[in-house]
Amino acid sequence: MSELEATIRQAKEALAENNAKKALKILKPFKSSLKKENANNVILNEVFADAYLDNGQVEKAYPILARACELDPEGQVGGPDKFFTMGQIMGGQDGVSIITRGIMNISNTGGEMLTNVQVEKIVGGLLSVIEIWMTDLCMEPNAEEQCEELIQKAMELTEGKSPETWSTLGSIKISQQKFGEAYEAFSQAWNFFELKKQEIGSGINENGDTTQKAGLQSEYVDLLQPLLSLTKMCLEVGAYEVALKVIAAVRDIDEDNIEGYYLEGFTYYLMSKLEIFKLNNPEVSLRPENIYEFNQLIQEVPLDLSHEPISQLIYDSRLALSFALQAGVNADSKDEIVQELLGGANALLQEIGGPLDPSELTQIKKGDLVNENEDLEELDIEEEYSD
């Protein structure tokens, strides 16, 4: 194995461990060669682009990624992933075109006997194209038709078993204001995410091969963002119990995930507001449609913190938001997303009684104190309007 091959392998291993800075450090000796003797090396261009992207340096990744796509137009050397990444960065009609090129490359290679990996990549490409149609191209007259056609293809390819496809379907239904159908789609998404998480977890525990195990661990961590996105979409249609199950899965993967804690606290906050609304408006039949409307008017619902029916919900909200603040103590002050989450957690806590004492959080973390809610039956809030 040459020095270059060893470097590429080590850099890929670092990226699999979600350590982009380490990967860039490993690659540094070959940086200047990208403009000289290794200018036409597809794999080196790809791994440099991946490292820059994972490190949040899109502007540095873009020209290198474009070069890789130019050098390997059929994806025969480095595979199709670069086309999907490039298309997502570009967006618009150009983005759709280059992602479609990647999809066609896989289809031409696999023919009628596509492997599971090839199907997964094609579906990922289809969902990326849908995202572009729902954002950059949403004002085009055929946008809705394109989304419907593409999601149907994705469903057919995965036999209706892809959690990501169900999540995207739910997002489409929200855009169409079909909130009941969105609710059902998100419930299905969670069912299949749960199965996927269990399968990957079992593979990690049972696999003795170090390389394969590292790959599975990377897949496990990769579930975080789609799960967090699903949580946020569940909240839009009042699928609160589903959201809490998804958040529990997030915690299994990353115990100190700040966004997960924030979303958990926000979910309980919404549930407490909804409980007050129900008590004050018993004649209203709650459904995903008016839960969506309710979310738009959430600030107008006053909270009485002494009101017994919501006391446990308020406590659970304070608990999760307090953990979010605790997890953010050592966060990068320049990370705008994290700082926004911490600001949101602080704002909610001011409304519901402030953070819990750090000593109480420590005891709960150790298991010395049990959250009272664990001994209560699950609230049936959403069942009343999910039919």
Curated annotation (Swiss-Prot):
Gene Ontology, cellular component aspect: cytoplasm; mitochondrial outer membrane; nucleus
UniProt key word Acyltransferase: no
Record InterPro entries: TPR-like_helical_dom_sf (IPR011990)
UniProt GO molecular function: mitochondrion targeting sequence binding; protein transporter activity; unfolded protein binding
Repeat region (TPR), residues: 42-75, 163-196, 224-257
SUPFAM superfamilies: TPR-like
Residues bearing PTM N-acetylserine: 2
Location of the protein in the cell: Cytoplasm; Nucleus
Alphabetical keyword list: Acetylation, Chaperone, Cytoplasm, Nucleus, Repeat, Ribosome biogenesis, TPR repeat
Region (Disordered): 363-387
GO BP, sorted A to Z: 'de novo' cotranslational protein folding; protein import into mitochondrial matrix; protein insertion into mitochondrial inner membrane; ribosomal large subunit biogenesis
Highest taxon listed in the record's lineage: Eukaryota
Phosphoprotein recorded as keyword: no
Bias type Acidic residues, positions: 371-387
Family: Belongs to the ACL4 family.
Anything else known: Present with 1630 molecules/cell in log phase SD medium.
Subunit annotation: Interacts with RPL4A and RPL4B.
Chain's role: Acts as a chaperone for the L4 ribosomal subunit encoded by RPL4A and PRPL4B, required for hierarchical ribosome assembly. Shields ribosomal protein L4 until timely release and insertion into the pre-ribosome is possible, once ribosomal protein L18 is present.
Protein name as annotated: Assembly chaperone of RPL4
